[in-house]
């Protein structure tokens, strides 16, 4: 369910090419201002049964002040119940869960991503040649060393040290506590390493092949002798005493002692509850002694002991031969974003791959840390020589766990949590596209392929004009509050994608500039190696204007409906050859675009719609999003009786066919009709065919740079489509239109359409002036080039013979000139950094 709701179609398809979907760019003109207001909260919760859920670590638990241990939602059950609920007890492995929480205040929205897991008590093994695959000391050594050897990565130790002072997560570790704990851990690691080496030498003469890091901990930290016979217990049982933890400043309630010669004290029952105000009653009950429901003691069987040495040789997991079991754990990431940010960039659908992978990586680190701490605590002696002991508790169901906030003072755990939060913040601020695709060598290779394809003068002219126009658009956007979009039309997808790669760094210089300093793309987007965004969940509508112009409205208040739509014509680009089903031909003949499906796809072609025909049925279906039925009839223009129209089999063939393809992509086949059918459709009483009405009513609101086949949009000779698109661009949610007009600023949106088949390049603009400028812009509006629509002015120009060189920002006529030959020559040299430098200093 999570895969189909939040994953892009290609990112989880193992057979897909890693280069697809690079054309998708984030649609914001600049980084949203409230990105800094996005907060991340990581919480580690433990479930030991008996409805006892304990918070072990909370990133908001700083300065010695405990947070809300219940973690209640504003209207729902406790968050701890949401983390662990509805999971079968027989389920093994890690489970990912997602919840939409009630926000703490109406101005924010909150989401919770939970990784539910159990620790791996067996750990890794040793191969037959006795070469250790994973050492018990690896966790301590790796955690105390650098996170990464690459100094440029923000997850290195330098980045950690530089951000430690600014991190509220690490402020709770005062100057005196950290060196002491660090020294203890360092000396502990050294002793463990030496002891492990000696134990490996001792094992070299044995036949043991299944030693785990957990038992290497036991070997190196303590020597377990054969227990003396005890008439009150099993002869191999070990008594639990109380100890003290220097890390937690609390009582270490269980500590397995190697001295069992004395009789057990009934008052010192194993795994007592932690010493806090909520457990006084339990402590009184424990002191009564001879409790009927006393938890079983951990018993080490005789088979795993060696009477001739002080080390355990070949042993399975300590929990496998006893009734004691480890607890279950939940790692929850709670994301809180401002309402405005959520309307533009849906955090779950946009960053799901990154969020899930970062939390899974943190979960693996926590698994190793808990496993080691658990066995160190279990193996610590009664003389309290253990420096890393953590207070333990045990439930009546024999599950062993830690006390409340037991890991809140563990430096290694805090570092792991802080590193994860640092990576999340870096990922949210990074561009949503793989930066390495725009490296110098890749860009040169792509540019040379395009120049080799441009052989005719018309092709070369289009190539130069397209580069110059894109550059001028970008320059004007930097200097003024202008929005623009670029649409490439072509019947050949590979050619259009090459142009997308070429124009992307010109429109987004940060993509290329950050490629050397950004995190490793494989670490950010490990599955696909590309951007992990989907279409953005937002709400918009074209404004109503006076006059005869009909502007369609769009309802995008959709929850969890971000899907990839693959739009392609029924007539393939390789018409002379039969259609092949291979993935390579599929990718080369179709278009990998992302759209909000219920806004850009007619509801009548929904796979779940029973009236849309049996050919729409597929094994994998989407859930129908909410809020679609209200605007379903408006998908077709002037349709009153949709049901009667759909009953006709003759009319069904004019509807786009929607099928679910590999990886969850939605395929939309646009059926082609001839001119006669279109002319009949215009005079007929039945609704017009999709080829006439147009399948998509506007350009995608989330992407500045787009590509599509020519027949997937309304004809660009239709003024209604052009004006509707430009009007929406004026109403960009990232701008405060009323404030800009109050400041007497001239608003403008621009649209450039390049048809790579006909070598034509058209630019469209729309202007909106303050009311005080009523007499000032009259000379600027020439009747032969402009149409007045209410109080908005639309202008279109055919610049097939050349691109504009300079846009006069003052209200005067445009000055048109040929393409910028000097800039084009810089591009042809292939030096991407030099090209970006020229762009930024023009």
Swiss-Prot record:
Q: Which UniProt keywords apply?
A: Cytoplasm, Phosphoprotein
Protein location:
Cytoplasm
Signal peptide range: none
One Pfam assignment: FNIP_N
| Taxonomic superkingdom | Eukaryota
Which cellular component appears as one GO term in the record?
Answer: FNIP-folliculin RagC/D GAP
The protein's name: Uncharacterized protein C30C2.07
**Taxon lineage:** Eukaryota, Fungi, Dikarya, Ascomycota, Taphrinomycotina
């Amino acid at each position: 369910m999570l895969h189909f709701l939040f994953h892009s179609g290609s990112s989880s398809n193992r057979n897909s090419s890693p280069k697809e979907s690079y054309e998708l760019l984030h649609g914001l003109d600049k980084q949203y201002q409230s990105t800094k207001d996005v907060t991340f909260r990581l919480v580690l919760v433990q479930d030991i049964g008996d409805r006892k859920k304990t918070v072990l670590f909370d990133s908001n638990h700083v300065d010695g002040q405990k947070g809300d241990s219940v973690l209640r939602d504003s209207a729902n059950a406790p968050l701890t119940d949401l983390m662990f609920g509805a999971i079968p007890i027989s389920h093994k492995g890690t489970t990912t869960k997602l919840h939409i929480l009630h926000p703490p205040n109406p101005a924010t929205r909150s989401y919770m991503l939970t990784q539910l897991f159990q620790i791996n008590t067996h750990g890794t093994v040793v191969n037959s040649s006795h070469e250790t695959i994973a050492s018990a000391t690896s966790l301590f050594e790796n955690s105390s060393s650098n996170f990464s050897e690459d100094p440029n990565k923000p997850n290195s130790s330098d980045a950690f040290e530089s951000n430690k002072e600014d991190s509220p997560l690490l402020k709770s570790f005062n100057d005196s506590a950290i060196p002491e704990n660090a020294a203890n851990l360092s000396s502990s690691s050294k002793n463990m390493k030496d002891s492990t080496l000696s134990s490996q030498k001792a094992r070299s003469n044995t036949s043991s092949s299944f030693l785990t890091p957990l038992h290497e901990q036991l070997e190196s930290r303590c020597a377990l002798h054969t227990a003396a016979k005890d008439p009150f217990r099993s002869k191999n049982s070990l008594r639990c005493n109380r100890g003290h933890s220097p890390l937690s400043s609390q009582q270490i309630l269980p500590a397995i002692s190697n001295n069992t010669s004395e009789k057990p004290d009934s008052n010192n029952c194993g795994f007592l509850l932690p010493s806090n105000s909520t457990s006084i009653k339990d402590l009184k009950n424990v002191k009564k002694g001879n409790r009927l429901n006393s938890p079983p003691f951990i018993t080490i069987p005789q088979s795993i002991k060696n009477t001739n040495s002080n080390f355990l040789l070949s042993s399975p997991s300590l929990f496998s031969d006893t009734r004691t079991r480890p607890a279950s754990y939940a790692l929850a990431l709670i994301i809180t974003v401002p309402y405005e940010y959520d309307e533009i960039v849906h955090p779950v659908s946009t960053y799901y791959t990154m969020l899930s992978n970062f939390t899974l990586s943190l979960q693996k680190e926590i698994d190793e840390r808990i496993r080691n701490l658990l066995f160190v605590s279990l193996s610590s002696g009664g003389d309290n020589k253990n420096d890393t002991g953590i207070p333990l508790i045990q439930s009546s169901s024999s599950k062993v766990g830690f006390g409340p906030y037991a890991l809140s003072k563990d430096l290694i755990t805090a570092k792991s949590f802080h590193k994860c939060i640092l990576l999340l913040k870096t990922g949210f601020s990074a561009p949503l596209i793989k930066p390495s695709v725009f490296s110098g060598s890749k860009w040169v290779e792509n540019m040379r392929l395009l120049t080799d394809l441009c052989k005719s003068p018309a092709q070369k002219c289009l190539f130069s004009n397209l580069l110059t126009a894109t550059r001028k658009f970008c320059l004007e956007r930097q200097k003024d509050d202008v929005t623009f979009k670029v649409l490439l039309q072509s019947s050949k997808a590979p050619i259009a994608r090459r142009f997308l790669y070429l124009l992307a760094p010109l429109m987004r210089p940060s993509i290329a500039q950050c490629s050397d300093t950004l995190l490793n793309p494989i670490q950010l987007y490990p599955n696909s190696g590309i951007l992990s965004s989907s279409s953005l969940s937002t709400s918009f509508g074209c404004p109503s204007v006076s006059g005869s112009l009909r502007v369609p409205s769009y309802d995008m208040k959709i929850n969890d409906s971000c899907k990839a739509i693959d739009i392609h014509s029924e007539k393939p680009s390789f018409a002379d050859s039969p259609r092949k089903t291979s993935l390579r031909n599929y990718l080369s003949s179709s278009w990998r675009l992302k759209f909000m499906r219920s806004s850009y796809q007619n509801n009548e072609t929904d796979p779940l719609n029973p009236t849309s025909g049996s050919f729409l049925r597929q094994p994998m279906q989407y859930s129908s999003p909410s809020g679609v039925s209200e605007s379903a009839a408006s998908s077709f223009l002037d349709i009153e009786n949709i049901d009667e129209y759909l009953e006709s089999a003759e009319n069904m063939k004019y509807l786009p066919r929607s099928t679910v393809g590999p990886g969850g992509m939605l395929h939309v086949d646009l059926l082609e009709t001839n001119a006669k059918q279109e002319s009949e459709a215009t005079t007929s009483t039945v609704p017009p065919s999709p080829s006439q009405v147009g399948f998509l009513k506007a350009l995608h609101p989330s992407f500045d740079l787009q590509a599509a086949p020519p027949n997937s949009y309304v004809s660009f000779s239709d003024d209604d489509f052009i004006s509707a698109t430009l009007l929406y661009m004026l109403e960009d949610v990232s701008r405060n239109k009323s404030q800009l007009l109050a400041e007497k600023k001239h608003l403008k949106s621009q649209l450039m359409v390049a048809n790579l088949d006909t070598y034509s390049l058209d630019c469209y603009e729309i202007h909106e002036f303050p009311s005080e400028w009523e007499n000032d812009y009259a000379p600027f509006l020439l009747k032969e080039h402009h149409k007045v629509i209410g109080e908005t002015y639309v202008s279109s120009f055919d610049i097939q013979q050349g691109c504009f060189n300079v846009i006069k920002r003052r209200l005067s006529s445009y000055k048109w000139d040929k393409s910028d030959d000097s800039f084009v020559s810089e591009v042809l040299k292939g030096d991407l950094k030099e090209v970006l430098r020229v762009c930024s200093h023009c």
